[in-house]
């Protein structure tokens, strides 16, 4: 009996305390009413009410009366805690400024009362909110998209409401909030450091967030596993993540899964499935998917060739790339072809060696102004083995500018005009440097001053002065000046609209490699403005722009992986870039497969896949790829032996790219009658053409011609009067099937013997000493008037 009385008293106290807390909440929430802000109160001002029960058509039911008792006791406990302690990570003013551990210490989890909706009351359907009746839970008025309902008919009058979520939904939401914290902490480390150890630590955070089904973390980790970026490469794990993302409708996941089916990595190759996933990815707005589809429609890969469809996809991507171009320009990406680098080890790939960079740094520290400006430009744009670093660029430009270098002043002006984390944006400071550089006749400064007058940056807009400075810069060949002149003529700003002049200056700027010049030319050719409309030309120009996007940095990442002998990571990265239409990636992927360096591809699939990418690279005009296609058909690598097809590829390489190797091969095929009728005269002609096309071909051509002379002599004897004597003579049977190789070897040995003998003769002949200088005759000084003037 006493227990029941105590329990009754306890319940009565709890009810009274709960009523008092509810009254206090009602008064507090009146200031944040929906009528005044047209949005629901934040999670901090209203407790999160969920239920362990079920939601049926928006109506929430409580499982038992015991749940109500527990909720009242929970409310009493909650009322003793201040609301200031309940800090939500997603609504903190600057979540990226705190690490995950700091945020976790500050944030306390929102306590969930198991009492249905607000105050334990069920939803009232319909309910009135902003003069509109709702028959089910809604997310209107909330920025976070959470469903809610009112517990009375008119929300404006009573302001009683609650969230329409079960305890399971609330747990998922809290898990997502924690996952977001972990993801932000990882991204802060990833974006704030260039050290590999810290980036690996960042990916540990991202992996943890991905394990909690955080979509962005899943996207990051899946591609990191695919490429082996700071994580051990695992194609199967990447595939599973792509499938999970695809089920959730992630465009990045769909594009990744499409790539796996296109390349046959981790799955059986299926171009049909690849096309489906690429299409879904493009519909979701993924730029990589758009670029892949643009290339496929342009080249007719898996689809009917359609220039207009390719134009649609490429133009969309090019619009994004052009909008990202800054005044200082983006990072420079070096396109290095592995076949060329291996064939010509001494070839300059454009990459700077570490010791050379250190030498320039030494010169810069000693006050060499040219070295300071050069290093400043390298660090400003990146590339050639130097990472982009605006702080170092600013420091080097400052040193050179203080020494009076106009180029450094102009680039400082560009950095101040653009603004960054290192250099604060300042039109006044930029104008100061531009004027100093322009007064010294520097075209970069003149172009910057023209931009200031064109857009009114620190000065009044003055189109005449803008035109004047752009013309001065363009006359000195500066691409920015040429581009801006073209834009002024195209839009008729400060001058009469003139599409011919615009086309002229855009062409000049494009010859200097300016991305926006290519973009503007593409727009003109696509719309037929100032020129005859040409879909093909527009697509090629837009493709050029698209290949300058931020994803092109993956080319250098793949190259570095190859240099580190991580061939699997390199080939996967090159394969994705090859899907996007990069010719250099297609040839590099084919080269790695051709060398059988990547174990990620099966033995039986190596040559067929290499053949596929050699073919795509050859169709984009790469000579080595065209010759490789001939070699593959000649020897039967990845396909059947087909001399006629090999002959066609060699002939194309000879006619279109004037390849000495292709000419030599054509000579050999004419000599042997492989894929073509045997013709000794045509064989000699192609051998001679090869020797003229390349000095490197002269020695093998000489040997081939010597052998050809012997063959011609034997053929002549056969057709002479003593034909009957040699009718039965079969050189292959007499000397063996490789008799021509033996003959070439003998000729080479004889030639070497003659050369050695001649050199020895020259050494034996005593070299006469030159006679000593004769004493100069004494000079007689003439009279002073005959001396020449000094």
UniProtKB/Swiss-Prot annotation:
GO terms for biological process: ERAD pathway; Notch signaling pathway; protein secretion; response to endoplasmic reticulum stress; retrograde protein transport, ER to cytosol; triglyceride metabolic process. CDD domains: FN2 (cd00062). Residues 639-719 are annotated as: Interaction with SYVN1. SUPFAM superfamilies: HCP-like, Kringle-like. Highly expressed in pancreas, white adipose tissue, liver and spleen (at protein level). Detected in heart, brain, spleen, lung, liver, kidney and testis. N-glycosylated. Its main location: endoplasmic reticulum. Residues 756-790 are cytoplasmic. Keywords: Disulfide bond, Endoplasmic reticulum, Glycoprotein, Membrane, Notch signaling pathway, Phosphoprotein, Repeat, Signal, Transmembrane, Transmembrane helix. Residues 348-533 are annotated as: Important for homodimerization and oligomerization. Residues 118-166 form the Fibronectin type-II domain. It is found in: Endoplasmic reticulum membrane. This is Protein sel-1 homolog 1. It comes from Mus musculus (Mouse). The lineage of its organism: Eukaryota, Metazoa, Chordata, Craniata, Vertebrata. The gene is Sel1l.
């Amino acid at each position: 009996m006493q227990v029941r009385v105590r329990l009754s008293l306890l319940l009565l106290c709890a009810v009274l305390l709960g009523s008092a807390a509810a009254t206090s909440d009602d008064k507090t929430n009146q200031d944040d009413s929906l009528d005044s802000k047209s949005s629901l109160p934040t999670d901090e001002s209203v407790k999160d009410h969920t239920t362990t029960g079920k939601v049926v058509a928006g109506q929430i039911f409580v499982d038992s009366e015991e749940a109500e008792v527990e909720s009242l006791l929970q409310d009493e406990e909650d009322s003793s805690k201040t609301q200031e302690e309940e800090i939500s990570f997603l609504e903190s003013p600057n979540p990226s400024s705190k690490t995950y551990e700091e945020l976790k210490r500050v944030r306390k989890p929102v306590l969930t009362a198991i009492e249905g909706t607000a105050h334990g009351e069920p939803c009232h359907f319909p309910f009135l909110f902003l003069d509109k009746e709702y028959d089910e839970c809604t997310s209107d008025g909330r920025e976070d998209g959470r469903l809610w309902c009112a517990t009375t008919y008119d929300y404006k009058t009573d302001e009683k409401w609650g969230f329409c979520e079960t305890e399971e939904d609330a747990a998922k939401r809290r898990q997502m909030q924690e996952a977001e914290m972990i993801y932000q902490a990882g991204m802060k480390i990833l974006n704030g450091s260039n050290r590999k150890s810290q980036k690996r630590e960042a990916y540990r955070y991202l992996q943890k967030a991905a394990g909690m089904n955080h979509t962005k973390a899943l996207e990051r980790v899946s591609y990191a596993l695919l490429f082996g970026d700071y994580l051990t490469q695992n194609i199967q794990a990447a595939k599973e993540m792509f499938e999970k993302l695809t089920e959730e409708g992630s465009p990045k996941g769909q594009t990744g899964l499409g790539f796996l089916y296109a390349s046959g990595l981790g799955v059986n190759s299926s171009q049909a499935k690849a096309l489906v996933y690429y299409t879904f990815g493009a519909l979701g707005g993924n730029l990589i998917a758009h670029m892949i589809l643009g290339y496929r429609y342009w080249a007719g890969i898996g689809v009917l060739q359609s220039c207009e469809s390719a134009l649609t996809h490429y133009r969309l991507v090019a619009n994004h790339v052009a909008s990202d171009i800054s005044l200082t320009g983006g990072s420079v990406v070096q396109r290095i072809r592995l076949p060329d680098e291996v064939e010509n080890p001494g070839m300059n790939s454009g990459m700077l060696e570490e010791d050379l960079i250190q030498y320039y740094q030494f010169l810069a520290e000693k006050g060499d102004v040219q070295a300071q400006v050069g290093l400043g430009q390298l660090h400003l744009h990146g590339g050639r083995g130097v990472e982009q670093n605006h702080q170092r660029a600013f420091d080097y430009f400052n040193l050179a500018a203080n020494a009076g270098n106009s180029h450094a002043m102009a680039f400082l002006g560009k950095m101040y005009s653009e603004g960054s984390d290192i250099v604060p944006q300042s039109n006044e400071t930029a104008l100061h440097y531009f004027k100093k550089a322009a007064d010294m006749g520097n075209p970069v400064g003149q172009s910057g001053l023209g931009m200031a007058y064109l857009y009114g940056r620190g000065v009044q807009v003055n189109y005449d002065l803008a035109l004047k400075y752009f013309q001065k810069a363009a006359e000195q060949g500066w691409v920015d000046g040429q581009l801006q002149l073209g834009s002024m003529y195209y839009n008729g700003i400060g001058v009469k609209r003139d599409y011919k002049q615009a086309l002229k200056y855009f062409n000049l700027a494009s010859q200097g490699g300016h991305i926006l010049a290519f973009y503007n030319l593409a727009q003109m050719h696509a719309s037929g403005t100032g020129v005859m409309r040409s879909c093909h030309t527009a697509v090629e120009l837009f493709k050029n722009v698209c290949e300058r996007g931020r994803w092109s940095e993956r080319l250098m990442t793949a190259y570095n992986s190859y240099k580190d002998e991580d061939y699997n990571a390199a080939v996967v990265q090159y394969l994705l870039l090859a899907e996007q239409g990069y010719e250099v990636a297609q040839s590099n992927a084919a080269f790695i497969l051709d060398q059988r360096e990547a174990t990620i591809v099966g033995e039986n699939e190596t040559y067929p896949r290499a053949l596929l990418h050699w073919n795509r690279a050859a169709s984009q005009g790469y000579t080595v790829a065209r010759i490789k296609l001939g070699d593959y058909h000649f020897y039967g690598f990845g396909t059947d032996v087909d001399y006629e097809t090999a002959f066609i590829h060699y002939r194309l390489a000879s006619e279109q790219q004037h390849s000495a190797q292709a000419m030599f091969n054509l000579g050999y095929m004419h000599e042997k009658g492989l894929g073509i009728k045997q013709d000794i005269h045509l064989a000699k002609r192609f051998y001679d053409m090869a020797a003229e096309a390349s000095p490197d071909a002269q020695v093998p051509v000489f040997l081939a011609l010597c052998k050809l002379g012997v063959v011609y002599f034997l053929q002549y004897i056969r057709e002479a009067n003593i034909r009957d004597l040699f009718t039965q003579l079969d050189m292959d049977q007499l000397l063996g099937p490789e008799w021509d190789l033996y003959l070439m070897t003998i000729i080479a040995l004889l030639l070497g013997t003659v050369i050695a003998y001649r050199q020895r003769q020259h050494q034996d002949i005593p070299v006469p000493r030159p006679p000593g200088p004769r004493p100069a005759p004494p000079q007689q000084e003439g009279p002073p008037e005959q001396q020449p003037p000094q």
